């Protein structure tokens, strides 16, 4: 499964399948005895996509050997920690008065339905038309009701998504909470820069941004992709996920944002595991160990 500059997908193929994969992990994490996230929509969304492996994974119906059990727990913990980090980011921004949020590459993200948004909150979901349409249909069938004003922006991030966002009512004069969750590695290095340029150009002072990145050299991307794929193969996944990441040297996210007017805070993934009461895995999981979580505030100190 190799990327091209004009490739497209649905939730059962290519990059779209990773959204289903992450939703399956959220379902697993939500079903734990002491969960740190609660996503009641993850499992039904995964079932609706119809990929057998991810459906069985979401419902805990896959038998594993000892290694695969460790992999499954690592997947659930990693996605739970990441999800909680972004949940907390949005809720903190809301407490600080931000009422406009944008979820880039929203996939099967259900935050517009499951977070306790303050009155007056507007949540924009940006993704490809087929992905948005699928989620709209499925959530409607589930009888789900958004907890904020939800506005969908049906556009590929490789196209003029800022114009599409503004066309759907986005207010550039108001501070915004932006998320780029699990996104950067699926963009070419130059597209990552353009994404941050666009966000900066749309952001009023006081806007906030959350993302995550690997600070190690781009030359190691292929190795990380193989580690990522091997873990899912051990769990029984028959979809090759190793060709989805773009290689090449990337801008350091912290440096790039700082140079473009953002006040940035960065924390290693290990710290988040500790904060949320999860045990960080052994040192051999270098793919996970190098991840840095980033929050930033535009035009003023955090």
Swiss-Prot record:
Query: Sorted alphabetically, which Pfam families does this protein's record hold?
Result: LCM
User: EC class of this enzyme?
Assistant: transferase
Q: What is its EC number?
A: 2.1.1.-
BP-aspect Gene Ontology terms: methylation
Keywords annotated in UniProt: Methyltransferase, S-adenosyl-L-methionine, Transferase
Q: Which GO terms describe its molecular function?
A: methyltransferase activity
Positions bound to S-adenosyl-L-methionine: 127, 156-157
Record-annotated membrane-spanning stretches: none
Q: Does the keyword Methyltransferase apply?
A: yes
Keyword Transcription regulation carried by entry? no
Tree of life domain = Bacteria
| Family of the protein in this entry | Belongs to the UPF0677 family.
NCBIfam families found in the cross-reference section = mthyl_TIGR00027
What is the annotated role of this protein in its UniProt record?
Answer: Exhibits S-adenosyl-L-methionine-dependent methyltransferase activity.
* Protein name, entry field: Putative S-adenosyl-L-methionine-dependent methyltransferase MMAR_1068
Q: Which species is listed as the source?
A: Mycobacterium marinum (strain ATCC BAA-535 / M)
């Amino acid at each position: 499964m190799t990327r091209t500059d004009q490739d497209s997908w649905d939730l059962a193929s290519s990059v779209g399948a990773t959204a289903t994969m992450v939703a399956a992990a959220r379902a697993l994490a939500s079903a734990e005895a002491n969960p740190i996230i609660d996503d009641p929509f993850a499992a039904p969304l995964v079932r609706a996509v119809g990929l057998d492996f991810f459906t069985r994974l979401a419902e805990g119906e896959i038998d594993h050997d000892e290694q695969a059990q460790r992999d499954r727990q690592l997947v659930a913990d990693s996605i739970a920690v990441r999800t909680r980090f972004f949940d907390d980011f949005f809720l903190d921004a809301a407490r600080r008065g931000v009422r406009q949020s944008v979820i880039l590459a929203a996939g099967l993200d259900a935050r517009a339905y499951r977070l306790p948004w303050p009155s007056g909150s507007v949540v924009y979901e940006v993704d490809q038309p087929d992905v948005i349409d699928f989620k709209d249909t499925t959530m409607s069938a589930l009888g789900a009701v958004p907890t904020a004003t939800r506005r969908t922006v049906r556009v590929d991030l490789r196209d003029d998504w800022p114009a599409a966002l503004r066309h759907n009512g986005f207010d550039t004069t108001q501070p915004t909470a932006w998320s780029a969750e699990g996104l950067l590695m699926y963009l070419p290095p130059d597209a990552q820069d353009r994404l941050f340029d666009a966000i900066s150009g749309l952001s009023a002072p006081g806007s906030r941004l959350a993302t995550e990145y690997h600070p190690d050299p781009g030359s190691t991307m292929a190795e990380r992709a193989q580690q990522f794929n091997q873990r899912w193969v051990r769990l029984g996944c028959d979809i090759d996920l190793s060709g989805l990441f773009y290689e090449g040297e990337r801008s350091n996210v912290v440096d790039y944002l700082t140079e473009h007017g953002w006040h940035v805070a960065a924390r290693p993934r290990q710290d988040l595991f500790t904060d949320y009461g999860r045990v960080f895995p052994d040192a051999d999981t270098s793919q996970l160990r190098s991840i840095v979580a980033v929050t930033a505030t535009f035009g003023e100190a955090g």
